Design a protein with these regions (language model features):
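Acidic catalytic/metal-coordinating carboxylates
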Residues: 37-40, 63-66
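C-terminal output helix
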Residues: 108-117
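Receiver (REC) domain active-site loop signature in two-component systems and cognate sites
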Residues: 59
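Short, conserved "switch-loop" micro-motifs in signal-transduction and mechanochemical regulators
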Residues: 86-87
Length: 124
């Protein structure tokens, strides 16, 4: 990878954040920050302006869809990958309507995550 790609992970699950961080860092990406909920994720995005955000949909305080909406309003070119549990089709459709770039389904598949992140990074 020629230049550093900075990624923000937004998820209320400590386990999910750890798995994603390990997976992303093993691919050469830099995780610049983690957030526990959508509100914190939005504030960290605003402060750090990472190249890409992974955002869980279901979180306390502010969900991922609301945070996605705020991020896209602030920066329409932001790259946001939504993380969802299987069976959340309605929420996936809503996130796409609000500007989500892609989806990753839990449990994480290393090849799927790598392919999606690489494709979005190359679009920048």
């Amino acid at each position: 990878m020629a230049e550093t790609v900075n990624i923000l992970i937004v998820d209320d699950s400590r386990t999910s954040k750890r798995i994603l961080r390990n997976l992303l860092e093993s691919q050469g990406y830099t995780v610049v920050a983690e957030a526990e909920n959508g509100e914190e994720g939005y504030l960290k995005y605003k402060e750090l302006r990472p190249d890409l955000v992974t955002m869980d949909i279901t979180m306390p305080k502010m969900d991922g869809i609301e945070s996605l909406t705020l991020i896209k309003k602030l920066d329409p070119n932001a790259k946001v990958v939504m993380i969802t549990a299987a069976g959340q089709k309605e929420k996936m459709v809503e996130a796409l309507k609000r500007g989500a770039d892609e989806f990753i389904t839990k449990p994480f598949d290393q090849e799927e995550v790598s392919t999606i992140i690489k494709r979005l990074v190359e679009q920048q």
